């Protein structure tokens, strides 16, 4: 099931589920369809769906079957015209760093021996503030003092139930679904910060976290390692990889960061594959983002996250 969070013309948050009608994809507005059908209660928001567990999912699937059979324009919204929101309300995101093997290797300038020595026992990363997250089709301003403006397509895991290091819970079962994340980065600031062993400002300028548009529920992904992610700038392919190149897998990241105590709606991002501008040869400046660029970040089976640089 593919889930969307968007808002109506009046500004109200809507929960939408993707369905096909007349050869096109539409969003079933869950609240509107439920109001017409009546009967069993269905979640009114993305967070209610996530927190409601299996019962909420079953009720939503039942409503989707009912609505899809009728295809009434009253509850069908066009994804090309809605105003998107981030897939979950404002949440900070735990971001893994150097977690794809080939990206880790390119970051060490091809030195496999040095690359193998980097944090091989557990995932490391940083926190991206919730206020940086922006939805599908957002315009993101390149900061005035940033020229080395980079992209990083990633998969963000959406946590579906509370989990911490004290609970005997299968980490994979805590994953509600997957969405697309673009970890925009100011490399000048990031590299200066990394000289002091930290990353903060270089990852946390306003708008540096495009995310969405959909959450694909975990039950629709039988083999997460087969997920393919890619990124294009102005139609040019820059990044492409499947998740078999991950160093720490989805469940391993959830298990490790559950030490924080994860709750429904929390986000964990995988890190990015090779192909970032920072390591482009011969000159990274040829690939850094600039005003006027259109960035498409995609995950096969989930969709495309579009961002415009201004």
Can you say where each PLM-predicted feature lies in the sequence?
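A generic local secondary-structure boundary/capping motif
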Residues: 4-5, 83-85, 113-116, 140-149, ...
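N-terminal non-catalytic cap/leader segment that marks the start of a structured domain
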Residues: 1-119, 294
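Residue "hotspots" at secondary-structure boundaries inside conserved domains
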Residues: 86, 92, 147-149, 260, ...
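A short secondary-structure junction signal
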Residues: 105-108, 136-139, 144, 166-171, ...
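Catalytic-pocket segment enriched in acidic/His residues
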Residues: 12-13, 57-61, 77, 83, ...
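Short, structured patches in soluble enzyme cores that scaffold and shape functional sites
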Residues: 7, 128-130, 137, 144, ...
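A gly/proline- and charged-residue-enriched helix-loop-helix capping module
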Residues: 116-137
